[in-house]
């Protein structure tokens, strides 16, 4: 059976989007997800993407429900770039019109989104989670109320931090982000037993109080050009540690996200672009 799809990207973090509100795609993906999703996301033998987004009817009075799969078939709780791509898809298909606030249901809960006049998409990412039990992580809370500890990797002792934006993130500060053995460190840390559910890994280089560089190793995907929830988690940790202000530009391999945490007892806001790459149809 042929199904329409659209491919969107947010800073190079790309997704295949299927509108599954009036078909049985959700059932098909749930039943056959592992090999099926890996094939669709394969850049040589499939469409090629970091993940797949299904648009579903919401059961909680939201505009729609977003279901997302990583390229390995796993289902993350939330994806910041993915939700921006979803909003761009809905906007391109004239579903949003004059709505000023678009509530989206996700596995991590209700997420509020907005489109500004330049079609930049702003997302209320909710309050960060810093409780080790809720992230979850075995790291212990330090005096600045951030989970923190050390991990030994061969001859390296890495000082690591943790935060969650509905999904777990490890933050590692480095002096030269291009000089680290990224593949080795990323793959090792993703599966480290300090994080019972595995984790996204972010290597952070501080430029100044308003700008940071981040390199992403995404749980279930490996290297990606950007991670929206990760950018937010990095800003939360850097601001808690006093390394940045409560708003900063986060420079990822795919481009820049603007992240703000105006009140440390409130939500984090992320803003950035999302664009259509192409659309088509595929036999499923």
From Swiss-Prot:
Citing just one GO molecular function, the answer is: diaminopimelate epimerase activity
Please report any disulfide bonds recorded for this protein chain, giving both cysteine positions: none
Q: Does the keyword Isomerase apply?
A: yes
Q: Which GO terms describe its cellular component?
A: cytosol
Q: Which residues form the active site?
A: 79 (proton donor), 227 (proton acceptor)
| Main localisation | cytoplasm
> Which Gene3D superfamilies does this one have?
Diaminopimelate Epimerase, Chain A, domain 1 (3.10.310.10)
Does Protein biosynthesis appear among the keywords?
no
Q: Which GO terms describe its biological process?
A: lysine biosynthetic process via diaminopimelate
A UniProt-annotated Pfam family:
DAP_epimerase
EC number annotated for this UniProt entry: 5.1.1.7
Task: Specify the domain of life of the species encoding this protein.
Answer: Bacteria
Q: Which PROSITE patterns match?
A: DAP_EPIMERASE
Query: What pathway is this protein said to act in by its record?
Result: Amino-acid biosynthesis; L-lysine biosynthesis via DAP pathway; DL-2,6-diaminopimelate from LL-2,6-diaminopimelate: step 1/1
Q: Which reaction does it catalyse?
A: (2S,6S)-2,6-diaminopimelate = meso-2,6-diaminopimelate
Where is substrate bound in this sequence?
Answer: 13, 70, 80-81, 167, 200, 218-219, 228-229
What UniProt keywords are attached to this protein's entry? Amino-acid biosynthesis, Cytoplasm, Isomerase, Lysine biosynthesis
Site description Could be important to modulate the pK values of the two catalytic cysteine residues, residues in chain? 169, 218
This chain's function reads: Catalyzes the stereoinversion of LL-2,6-diaminopimelate (L,L-DAP) to meso-diaminopimelate (meso-DAP), a precursor of L-lysine and an essential component of the bacterial peptidoglycan.
Q: Which family does it belong to?
A: Belongs to the diaminopimelate epimerase family.
Q: How does it assemble?
A: Homodimer.
Mind telling me what this protein is named?
Diaminopimelate epimerase
């Amino acid at each position: 059976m042929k199904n329409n799809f659209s491919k969107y990207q947010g800073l190079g973090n790309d997704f295949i989007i299927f509108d599954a509100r009036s078909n049985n795609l959700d059932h098909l993906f749930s039943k056959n997800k592992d090999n099926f999703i890996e094939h669709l996301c394969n850049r040589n033998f499939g469409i090629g993407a970091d993940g797949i987004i299904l648009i579903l009817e919401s059961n909680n009075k939201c505009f729609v429900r977003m279901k997302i799969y990583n390229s390995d078939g796993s289902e993350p709780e939330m994806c910041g770039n993915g939700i921006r791509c979803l909003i761009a898809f809905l906007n391109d298909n004239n579903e949003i019109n004059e709505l000023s606030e678009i509530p989206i249901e996700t596995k991590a809960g209700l997420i509020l989104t907005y489109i500004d006049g330049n079609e930049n998409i702003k997302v209320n990412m909710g309050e960060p989670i810093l409780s080790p039990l809720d992230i979850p992580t075995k790291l212990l809370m330090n005096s600045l109320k951030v989970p923190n500890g050390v991990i030994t990797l061969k001859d390296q002792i890495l000082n690591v931090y943790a935060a969650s934006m509905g999904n777990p993130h490890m933050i590692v500060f480095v002096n030269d982000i291009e000089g680290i053995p990224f593949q080795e460190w990323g793959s090792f840390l993703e599966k480290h037993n300090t994080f019972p559910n595995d984790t996204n890994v972010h290597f952070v280089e501080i430029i100044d109080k308003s700008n940071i560089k981040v390199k992403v190793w995404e749980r279930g995907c490996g290297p990606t050009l950007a991670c929206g929830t990760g950018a937010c988690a990095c800003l939360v940790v850097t601001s808690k540690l006093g390394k940045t202000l409560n708003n900063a530009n986060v420079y990822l391999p795919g481009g820049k996200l603007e992240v703000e945490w105006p009140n440390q007892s409130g939500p984090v806001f992320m803003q950035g672009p999302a664009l259509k790459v192409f659309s088509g149809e595929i036999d499923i």
